[in-house]
Swiss-Prot record:
GO molecular function terms listed in the Swiss-Prot or TrEMBL record: S-adenosylmethionine:tRNA ribosyltransferase-isomerase activity
Recorded metabolic or biological pathway in which this protein acts: tRNA modification; tRNA-queuosine biosynthesis
Keyword set includes Chloroplast: no
Catalytic reaction(s) noted: 7-aminomethyl-7-carbaguanosine(34) in tRNA + S-adenosyl-L-methionine = epoxyqueuosine(34) in tRNA + adenine + L-methionine + 2 H(+)
GO annotation (BP), single: tRNA wobble guanine modification
Primary localization class, coarse: cytoplasm
Protein name in UniProt: S-adenosylmethionine:tRNA ribosyltransferase-isomerase
GO cellular component: cytoplasm
Organism: Lysinibacillus sphaericus (strain C3-41)
Length: 346
Protein backbone atom coordinates (compact mmCIF):
# COMPACT_ATOMS: atom_id res chain seq x y z
CA UNK A 1 0.00 0.00 0.00
CA UNK A 2 1.08 3.57 -0.62
CA UNK A 3 1.71 6.12 2.14
CA UNK A 4 -0.44 8.54 0.13
CA UNK A 5 -3.44 6.28 0.81
CA UNK A 6 -3.42 7.60 4.40
CA UNK A 7 -3.24 11.31 3.63
CA UNK A 8 -5.90 13.90 4.46
CA UNK A 9 -6.20 17.68 4.63
CA UNK A 10 -5.60 19.07 8.12
CA UNK A 11 -5.84 22.82 8.80
CA UNK A 12 -3.00 23.86 11.13
CA UNK A 13 -5.37 25.67 13.48
CA UNK A 14 -6.89 22.31 14.50
CA UNK A 15 -3.61 21.20 16.11
CA UNK A 16 -4.25 21.60 19.85
CA UNK A 17 -1.45 23.64 21.46
CA UNK A 18 -2.56 23.39 25.09
CA UNK A 19 -4.48 20.82 27.16
CA UNK A 20 -8.03 21.50 28.33
CA UNK A 21 -8.47 22.43 32.01
CA UNK A 22 -10.72 19.38 32.57
CA UNK A 23 -9.20 16.20 31.15
CA UNK A 24 -12.60 14.60 30.50
CA UNK A 25 -13.98 17.68 28.70
CA UNK A 26 -12.40 16.59 25.42
CA UNK A 27 -14.76 15.53 22.68
CA UNK A 28 -15.12 11.86 21.79
CA UNK A 29 -15.93 10.59 18.33
CA UNK A 30 -17.44 7.10 18.46
CA UNK A 31 -16.67 5.02 15.38
CA UNK A 32 -18.14 1.68 14.31
CA UNK A 33 -15.76 -0.34 12.08
CA UNK A 34 -16.99 -0.60 8.51
CA UNK A 35 -19.47 2.28 8.89
CA UNK A 36 -19.19 5.96 7.96
CA UNK A 37 -21.72 6.92 10.64
CA UNK A 38 -20.12 8.45 13.74
CA UNK A 39 -21.42 9.74 17.07
CA UNK A 40 -20.22 13.00 18.62
CA UNK A 41 -19.89 12.81 22.41
CA UNK A 42 -17.69 14.06 25.26
CA UNK A 43 -14.98 11.86 26.71
CA UNK A 44 -16.89 10.87 29.85
CA UNK A 45 -19.27 9.01 27.48
CA UNK A 46 -16.59 6.32 27.21
CA UNK A 47 -18.14 4.89 30.39
CA UNK A 48 -21.32 4.11 28.40
CA UNK A 49 -19.33 2.31 25.70
CA UNK A 50 -17.57 -0.04 28.14
CA UNK A 51 -19.50 -3.10 29.26
CA UNK A 52 -19.42 -5.12 32.46
CA UNK A 53 -16.87 -7.89 31.95
CA UNK A 54 -14.70 -5.91 29.52
CA UNK A 55 -11.04 -5.06 30.20
CA UNK A 56 -9.50 -1.60 29.80
CA UNK A 57 -5.73 -1.74 29.20
CA UNK A 58 -3.65 1.37 29.91
CA UNK A 59 0.05 2.20 29.48
CA UNK A 60 1.52 3.36 32.81
CA UNK A 61 4.78 4.73 31.39
CA UNK A 62 5.98 8.06 32.79
CA UNK A 63 7.46 10.76 30.55
CA UNK A 64 10.92 11.91 31.54
CA UNK A 65 11.51 15.69 31.54
CA UNK A 66 14.23 14.68 29.11
CA UNK A 67 15.13 17.99 27.43
CA UNK A 68 18.16 19.54 29.12
CA UNK A 69 19.55 23.00 28.26
CA UNK A 70 23.25 23.29 29.09
CA UNK A 71 26.46 25.11 28.24
CA UNK A 72 29.67 23.76 26.76
CA UNK A 73 32.27 24.04 29.52
CA UNK A 74 35.03 25.02 27.12
CA UNK A 75 33.29 27.87 25.24
CA UNK A 76 30.01 28.67 27.02
CA UNK A 77 28.04 27.75 23.86
CA UNK A 78 24.42 26.75 24.51
CA UNK A 79 23.72 23.05 23.88
CA UNK A 80 20.39 21.18 23.99
CA UNK A 81 20.51 17.52 25.04
CA UNK A 82 17.51 15.22 24.68
CA UNK A 83 17.74 11.98 26.65
CA UNK A 84 16.59 8.94 24.66
CA UNK A 85 17.72 5.75 26.38
CA UNK A 86 19.72 4.86 29.48
CA UNK A 87 22.34 2.18 28.95
CA UNK A 88 21.51 -0.59 31.47
CA UNK A 89 23.31 -0.39 34.80
CA UNK A 90 25.26 2.78 33.95
CA UNK A 91 25.04 6.58 34.09
CA UNK A 92 25.41 6.66 30.30
CA UNK A 93 22.58 7.74 28.00
CA UNK A 94 21.95 7.79 24.28
CA UNK A 95 20.87 11.33 23.40
CA UNK A 96 20.09 13.71 20.57
CA UNK A 97 22.12 16.93 20.63
CA UNK A 98 21.61 20.36 19.05
CA UNK A 99 23.83 21.69 17.54
CA UNK A 100 25.53 18.31 17.16
CA UNK A 101 28.56 19.66 15.30
CA UNK A 102 29.74 21.43 18.47
CA UNK A 103 29.86 18.24 20.53
CA UNK A 104 32.75 15.79 20.09
CA UNK A 105 33.95 12.89 22.23
CA UNK A 106 35.36 14.42 25.42
CA UNK A 107 33.15 17.54 25.33
CA UNK A 108 31.85 18.45 28.79
CA UNK A 109 28.44 20.11 29.19
CA UNK A 110 27.21 21.73 32.41
CA UNK A 111 23.55 21.99 33.45
CA UNK A 112 21.95 24.01 36.25
CA UNK A 113 25.06 25.85 37.51
CA UNK A 114 26.96 22.59 37.88
CA UNK A 115 24.21 20.55 39.54
CA UNK A 116 24.67 18.11 36.65
CA UNK A 117 27.52 17.64 34.18
CA UNK A 118 27.92 15.29 31.23
CA UNK A 119 30.91 14.07 29.23
CA UNK A 120 30.42 12.95 25.62
CA UNK A 121 31.61 9.35 25.27
CA UNK A 122 30.56 8.53 21.71
CA UNK A 123 29.03 9.73 18.43
CA UNK A 124 25.93 8.12 16.87
CA UNK A 125 23.98 8.72 13.64
CA UNK A 126 21.68 11.71 13.01
CA UNK A 127 23.05 14.02 15.71
CA UNK A 128 23.11 11.30 18.34
CA UNK A 129 25.67 11.23 21.13
CA UNK A 130 26.30 9.10 24.20
CA UNK A 131 26.98 10.96 27.46
CA UNK A 132 28.12 9.88 30.89
CA UNK A 133 26.43 12.00 33.58
CA UNK A 134 28.04 13.16 36.84
CA UNK A 135 26.04 14.34 39.84
CA UNK A 136 25.54 14.15 43.60
CA UNK A 137 22.27 12.63 44.82
CA UNK A 138 19.54 10.93 42.78
CA UNK A 139 19.70 11.44 39.01
CA UNK A 140 15.95 11.39 38.36
CA UNK A 141 15.28 13.95 41.12
CA UNK A 142 17.84 16.29 39.54
CA UNK A 143 16.23 15.66 36.14
CA UNK A 144 12.79 16.64 37.53
CA UNK A 145 14.39 19.89 38.71
CA UNK A 146 16.34 20.81 35.56
CA UNK A 147 14.63 19.03 32.67
CA UNK A 148 11.81 20.20 30.42
CA UNK A 149 9.13 18.01 28.87
CA UNK A 150 10.08 16.90 25.32
CA UNK A 151 6.88 18.10 23.66
CA UNK A 152 6.20 17.02 20.07
CA UNK A 153 7.56 19.35 17.35
CA UNK A 154 4.06 20.50 16.33
CA UNK A 155 3.37 21.97 19.81
CA UNK A 156 4.93 25.41 20.01
CA UNK A 157 3.30 26.73 23.19
CA UNK A 158 5.26 26.40 26.44
CA UNK A 159 3.66 23.93 28.86
CA UNK A 160 3.05 25.65 32.20
CA UNK A 161 2.31 22.49 34.19
CA UNK A 162 4.51 19.42 33.54
CA UNK A 163 1.85 17.11 34.97
CA UNK A 164 -0.50 17.89 32.06
CA UNK A 165 1.81 15.88 29.79
CA UNK A 166 1.54 12.88 32.16
CA UNK A 167 -1.37 10.51 32.62
CA UNK A 168 -2.82 10.49 36.15
CA UNK A 169 -1.58 6.89 36.50
CA UNK A 170 1.95 7.45 35.09
CA UNK A 171 4.36 5.32 37.11
CA UNK A 172 7.22 3.66 35.22
CA UNK A 173 9.84 6.24 34.14
CA UNK A 174 11.21 5.97 30.62
CA UNK A 175 9.19 7.67 27.86
CA UNK A 176 10.26 10.44 25.50
CA UNK A 177 6.58 11.20 24.78
CA UNK A 178 3.25 10.69 26.53
CA UNK A 179 0.84 7.87 25.66
CA UNK A 180 -1.64 10.61 24.81
CA UNK A 181 -4.92 8.64 24.70
CA UNK A 182 -4.55 8.19 28.45
CA UNK A 183 -4.39 11.95 29.11
CA UNK A 184 -8.21 12.10 29.00
CA UNK A 185 -8.70 9.90 32.06
CA UNK A 186 -9.11 11.21 35.61
CA UNK A 187 -8.83 9.09 38.75
CA UNK A 188 -12.57 9.61 39.25
CA UNK A 189 -13.44 8.31 35.78
CA UNK A 190 -11.23 5.25 36.28
CA UNK A 191 -13.03 4.51 39.57
CA UNK A 192 -16.37 4.74 37.72
CA UNK A 193 -15.04 2.30 35.11
CA UNK A 194 -14.10 -0.19 37.84
CA UNK A 195 -17.44 0.30 39.60
CA UNK A 196 -19.16 -0.77 36.38
CA UNK A 197 -17.42 -4.14 36.56
CA UNK A 198 -14.76 -3.38 33.96
CA UNK A 199 -11.27 -4.71 34.71
CA UNK A 200 -8.57 -2.00 34.61
CA UNK A 201 -5.11 -3.33 33.75
CA UNK A 202 -1.76 -1.54 33.44
CA UNK A 203 1.05 -2.52 31.11
CA UNK A 204 4.18 -0.56 30.12
CA UNK A 205 5.64 0.61 26.83
CA UNK A 206 8.23 3.39 26.89
CA UNK A 207 7.36 5.67 23.98
CA UNK A 208 10.39 6.64 21.88
CA UNK A 209 10.90 9.59 19.57
CA UNK A 210 10.25 7.23 16.68
CA UNK A 211 6.56 7.88 17.37
CA UNK A 212 7.04 11.28 15.64
CA UNK A 213 9.24 9.93 12.85
CA UNK A 214 7.62 10.55 9.45
CA UNK A 215 7.25 7.68 7.01
CA UNK A 216 9.86 8.49 4.37
CA UNK A 217 9.18 5.63 1.93
CA UNK A 218 6.49 5.46 -0.76
CA UNK A 219 5.37 1.92 0.05
CA UNK A 220 4.40 1.37 3.70
CA UNK A 221 5.69 -2.22 3.61
CA UNK A 222 9.23 -0.77 3.40
CA UNK A 223 8.94 1.37 6.55
CA UNK A 224 10.90 0.28 9.62
CA UNK A 225 9.76 1.18 13.14
CA UNK A 226 12.12 2.15 15.98
CA UNK A 227 12.28 -0.44 18.77
CA UNK A 228 10.59 0.43 22.08
CA UNK A 229 10.81 -1.33 25.45
CA UNK A 230 7.67 -3.02 26.84
CA UNK A 231 6.78 -4.97 29.96
CA UNK A 232 3.69 -6.96 30.96
CA UNK A 233 3.27 -8.51 34.42
CA UNK A 234 1.83 -11.94 35.14
CA UNK A 235 -1.15 -10.35 36.92
CA UNK A 236 -1.96 -8.19 33.88
CA UNK A 237 -1.60 -11.12 31.47
CA UNK A 238 -3.80 -13.38 33.60
CA UNK A 239 -6.57 -10.76 33.82
CA UNK A 240 -6.59 -10.10 30.07
CA UNK A 241 -6.68 -13.82 29.24
CA UNK A 242 -9.48 -14.46 31.75
CA UNK A 243 -11.60 -11.63 30.31
CA UNK A 244 -11.11 -12.98 26.78
CA UNK A 245 -12.03 -16.52 27.85
CA UNK A 246 -15.22 -15.19 29.45
CA UNK A 247 -16.26 -13.34 26.29
CA UNK A 248 -15.33 -9.82 27.42
CA UNK A 249 -13.77 -7.29 25.06
CA UNK A 250 -10.21 -5.98 25.37
CA UNK A 251 -10.22 -2.19 24.98
CA UNK A 252 -6.75 -0.73 24.54
CA UNK A 253 -6.11 2.85 25.61
CA UNK A 254 -3.76 4.14 22.95
CA UNK A 255 -1.68 2.77 20.12
CA UNK A 256 1.17 1.98 22.55
CA UNK A 257 -1.00 -0.39 24.60
CA UNK A 258 -2.24 -1.89 21.33
CA UNK A 259 1.26 -2.51 19.98
CA UNK A 260 2.36 -4.10 23.26
CA UNK A 261 -0.58 -6.51 23.40
CA UNK A 262 -0.28 -7.42 19.73
CA UNK A 263 3.49 -7.95 20.00
CA UNK A 264 2.83 -10.67 22.57
CA UNK A 265 -0.48 -12.01 21.25
CA UNK A 266 0.84 -12.47 17.72
CA UNK A 267 3.53 -14.82 19.09
CA UNK A 268 1.20 -16.97 21.21
CA UNK A 269 -2.01 -17.36 19.17
CA UNK A 270 -3.81 -14.54 20.97
CA UNK A 271 -2.67 -15.45 24.47
CA UNK A 272 -0.99 -12.71 26.51
CA UNK A 273 2.02 -13.82 28.54
CA UNK A 274 4.11 -12.02 31.13
CA UNK A 275 7.28 -10.82 29.45
CA UNK A 276 9.44 -7.82 28.70
CA UNK A 277 11.49 -6.95 25.67
CA UNK A 278 11.76 -4.63 22.68
CA UNK A 279 9.14 -4.29 19.98
CA UNK A 280 9.23 -2.74 16.54
CA UNK A 281 5.83 -4.11 15.47
CA UNK A 282 4.27 -2.12 12.61
CA UNK A 283 0.51 -2.62 12.28
CA UNK A 284 -1.03 -1.68 8.94
CA UNK A 285 -3.98 -2.96 6.84
CA UNK A 286 -3.64 -6.68 6.23
CA UNK A 287 -2.69 -7.37 9.84
CA UNK A 288 -5.13 -9.49 11.88
CA UNK A 289 -5.57 -8.44 15.51
CA UNK A 290 -5.04 -11.23 18.04
CA UNK A 291 -5.85 -9.52 21.37
CA UNK A 292 -7.30 -6.02 20.96
CA UNK A 293 -11.02 -5.64 20.21
CA UNK A 294 -11.58 -1.90 20.67
CA UNK A 295 -9.42 1.21 20.93
CA UNK A 296 -9.41 4.64 22.54
CA UNK A 297 -7.02 6.92 20.67
CA UNK A 298 -6.36 10.53 19.71
CA UNK A 299 -6.50 12.03 16.21
CA UNK A 300 -3.18 11.51 14.46
CA UNK A 301 -0.94 13.04 11.80
CA UNK A 302 -1.69 12.49 8.11
CA UNK A 303 0.36 9.65 6.59
CA UNK A 304 1.58 8.52 10.04
CA UNK A 305 2.03 4.93 11.22
CA UNK A 306 -0.64 5.66 13.85
CA UNK A 307 -3.27 6.45 11.20
CA UNK A 308 -2.28 3.18 9.54
CA UNK A 309 -2.80 1.30 12.82
CA UNK A 310 -6.28 2.69 13.49
CA UNK A 311 -7.19 2.05 9.83
CA UNK A 312 -6.33 -1.60 10.38
CA UNK A 313 -8.82 -1.90 13.25
CA UNK A 314 -11.66 0.16 11.78
CA UNK A 315 -10.92 -0.05 8.00
CA UNK A 316 -9.18 2.70 6.03
CA UNK A 317 -12.42 3.98 4.51
CA UNK A 318 -14.08 4.34 7.93
CA UNK A 319 -11.09 6.20 9.40
CA UNK A 320 -10.63 8.60 6.47
CA UNK A 321 -14.36 9.37 6.54
CA UNK A 322 -14.22 9.91 10.32
CA UNK A 323 -11.17 12.18 10.01
CA UNK A 324 -12.90 14.23 7.32
CA UNK A 325 -15.87 14.68 9.65
CA UNK A 326 -13.49 15.55 12.51
CA UNK A 327 -11.99 18.35 10.41
CA UNK A 328 -15.44 19.63 9.41
CA UNK A 329 -16.58 19.58 13.07
CA UNK A 330 -13.34 21.23 14.19
CA UNK A 331 -12.13 18.48 16.50
CA UNK A 332 -8.77 19.18 18.18
CA UNK A 333 -5.91 17.04 16.84
CA UNK A 334 -2.80 15.31 18.21
CA UNK A 335 -1.34 15.08 21.73
CA UNK A 336 -3.55 17.63 23.52
CA UNK A 337 -6.52 17.05 21.23
CA UNK A 338 -9.78 15.12 21.28
CA UNK A 339 -10.32 11.36 21.29
CA UNK A 340 -11.84 8.59 19.20
CA UNK A 341 -13.43 5.36 20.44
CA UNK A 342 -13.31 2.52 17.92
CA UNK A 343 -16.01 0.07 18.98
CA UNK A 344 -15.30 -3.65 19.08
CA UNK A 345 -16.81 -5.63 16.23
CA UNK A 346 -19.87 -7.58 17.35
Amino acid sequence: MRVEDFDFELPEELIAQTPLVDRTASRLMVVTPGSNEVEHQHFAHVLEELRTGDCLVLNDTRVLPARLMGVKEETGAHIEVLLLKQLPGTDEWETLVKPAKRVKVGTVITFGDGLLTATCTGELDHGGRTFEFHYDGIFFEILEQLGEMPLPPYIREKLEDKDRYQTVYAKERGSAAAPTAGLHFTEELLEQVKAKGVEVVFITLHVGLGTFRPVSVDSIENHEMHAEFYSVTEEAADTINRVKRNGGKIIAVGTTSTRTLETIGSKYDGEVRAEQGWTSIFIYPGYTFTVVDGLITNFHLPKSTLVMLVSTLATRETILSAYQQAVEEKYRFFSFGDAMFIRPKE
